[in-house]
Every structure is written in C-alpha cells, then in structure tokens.
From Swiss-Prot:
Belongs to the calycin superfamily. Lipocalin family. This is Epididymal-specific lipocalin-8. It comes from Mus musculus (Mouse). Predominantly expressed in epididymis. The keyword Glycoprotein applies. The lineage of its organism: Eukaryota, Metazoa, Chordata, Craniata, Vertebrata. Its main location: secreted. It is found in: Secreted.
Length: 175
C-alpha cells in the first residue's frame, strides 16, 4: 500500500511538472507590450490577497533585454502610478526587478489575455502570486480565464469586481 501511495504521489508530481512546462511560452516582447487590465489574483498566501494597494492595470514597454512596467493603483480615489525597470533572465519570459522581485510570463495569446507569476522574496520567504490580465476593459471572461482557473485550483482566488477607472486612464495614456 505504501508503494502504491508513493507511486501515485510521484505520478501526480510528474503530471504537475509536465503541466508547468507546457505553460511556458516563447515570449515575443513586441506582441505582449502595451496595456493589460488586472482581472484576477491567486495565491495561497492570505497576506497577498489582502494587500491594500491592488494593481488595476499595467503598461509594458520593452527595450533590448529590459522591460519597464508601469502599474496604476487606486489610492483613496486618486490614480497612482509606479514604474519599475526589470531585466530579462536566462529563461525566456522571466524578468528580475529590484527588491528581489521576479515576473514570469506563464501563458499569453498576446491579443486577449496573459497569465503572470510574480515572486517576491520578503522576510526570507518567497511569496508567489498568479495574476490574470486582459487587454479589454469590459470583457474579463476570455478563454485564458479558464486556463487561469485550472492553474490556480488549489490556491486562494480573488476576483476583482471594481470598474477600474485608473486602468481606463492608463489605457488612454492619461496617467
């Protein structure tokens, strides 16, 4: 019985690894550049899900091996932007940022959705967050959302339900 249990655990682990590998994309920076609205966040860490500042939207710009991420937040009714410069890592689709932060593009169709994995080293621990973004301000239920749900089935899921006025202003280039 113990051997069968060990075999099943190893089998599940192998399937998980294969599934994780299959989500790697050959990133084309020019195609993923531009506006993205945050729709959903998943993490097994409640601290991450209860963050005071929630990103409403991102604007990605690429130059050489670098990426500039301009994020917009709603802070007490005012839109606040924050920019961060990251550099490409050895693995395609992975970028390192100051402050022990990393972004990994897990999946994208470039036109409608992207799924990012954010990693933050804080107080000696790695925190992982999966985020689902769309290009559209209105339509959040894209085909990639179901993939996101599958990827995050064992984690906490937080759906963003607000209008996203700051994301709208970012898309229009007004912030």
């Amino acid at each position: 019985m113990e051997a069968r249990l060990l075999s099943n655990v190893c089998g599940f682990f192998l399937v998980f690894l294969l599934q994780a590998e299959s989500t790697r994309v050959e990133l084309v920076p020019e195609k993923i550049a531009g506006f993205w609205k945050e729709v959903a966040v998943a993490s097994d860490q409640k601290l991450v899900l209860k963050a005071q500042r929630r990103v409403e939207g991102l604007f990605l710009t690429f130059s050489g091996g670098n990426v500039t991420v301009k994020a917009v937040y709603n802070s007490s009714g005012s839109c606040v932007t924050e920019s961060s410069l990251g550099s490409e890592r050895d693995t395609v689709g992975e970028f390192a940022f100051p402050g022990n932060r990393e972004i990994h593009v897990l999946d994208t169709d470039y036109e409608r959705y992207t799924i990012l994995k954010l990693t933050l080293l804080w107080q000696g621990r790695n925190f992982h967050v999966l985020k689902y973004f769309t290009r559209s301000l209105e339509n959040e239920d894209e085909p990639g959302f179901w993939l996101f749900r599958e990827m995050t089935a064992d984690q906490g899921l937080y759906m963003l339900a607000r209008h996203g006025r700051c994301a709208e202003l970012l898309k229009e280039g007004l912030v």
